[in-house]
């Protein structure tokens, strides 16, 4: 519920004369390409960057950046003189009191016990320390944007990147805005997340910035996908092609516009790595860190770096290690991290965390504390997500059900093309085969292949089969390569077939 205080302050700022980005936001709205949720997230992003000076959340809350209760309102409340004086003089105390007094979605109060404790013993609570603990002691700007799947998180990332570059190029000395970007995808989702992140390269910056500025910035962009596996020779010395990709952009002092995407596990590995591409490296005294993880070391050298962490809620197991890496980048000798921006569809912890307030009272919350913007799934469903249509059949023959579905799809969408510059997209049908890989390969695939040929479609061009393979059927490597690079395809296959192995993902 801390994010509701941020949103309230953001709206007040945006409606004030102090806000100088109204014309920019009006332009974004006029293009008609961004959803309301994305526009509101961008407002929040710029509010934190400009009005809040890109400061860490614990500092902002301690300084009362999001407080809204006035002295007049406090004087009208039933408070003791000591409590009122404490709330008027201690901005962190007022922030906690305002937080605890908020109404929940169900109409209750966030924390009756905390408000009562502040009223009874206002001077017995170390308010600043509680804020530091609830934000994990982070001393840099670390903001989480929560939007459900399908709301456009990937394009929101792209918008943030172009907005930062726009302001950074106007004033290179302004450290609030990043010049280079690293996007970390969660380890378990690399086959699905990294490909979608590649769509950032296709984002049209004219959706958020007017021409010719948009095109000028895009021409300066450099995209690197750090997805290569290390290769080892007989000498037991390892070459890391991902490091080579970064090293080629030296010198780093003036580097601007690099967007690199990698898997989170590639920067939290602890194994010793010795590289052979020594001719690419600059001399450094940080030998121990460099040997621990070459890629981590080189990412840490990028100037004015913004770290994007996608699908934060999927990375809980490695969160401590990943946080430690980011802390090293942010607090190292160069202190080159401009901010850390997280994206998630579910801004909740698996279980509530308890932060001690006094010896006898703790504050418990299941919200991820650094959430600054939250767009609920229920709002997304009401505004733009698709409603499922469930059809019931009395026919028990599964192949006849498949035939009915495929024919209906082809009759309705066969020639439908979605023009979404710079690419065009075809309508797609996914067929999930719960009976296993053998049934998919031996029954479903031949059946649908013959079926779509009746409509003039070539099965080799319009069907992709996905499964991990078994002793009878090999894994379709062509599919994995295709799905990984599909962001660059001008037109995609119409049919995706999945076996029950897909449940693993």
Name these PLM-found stretches:
Residues 147, 151-169, 190-201, 261-410, ...:
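Signature of the SF2 helicase/ATPase Hel1-core->accessory helical subdomain module
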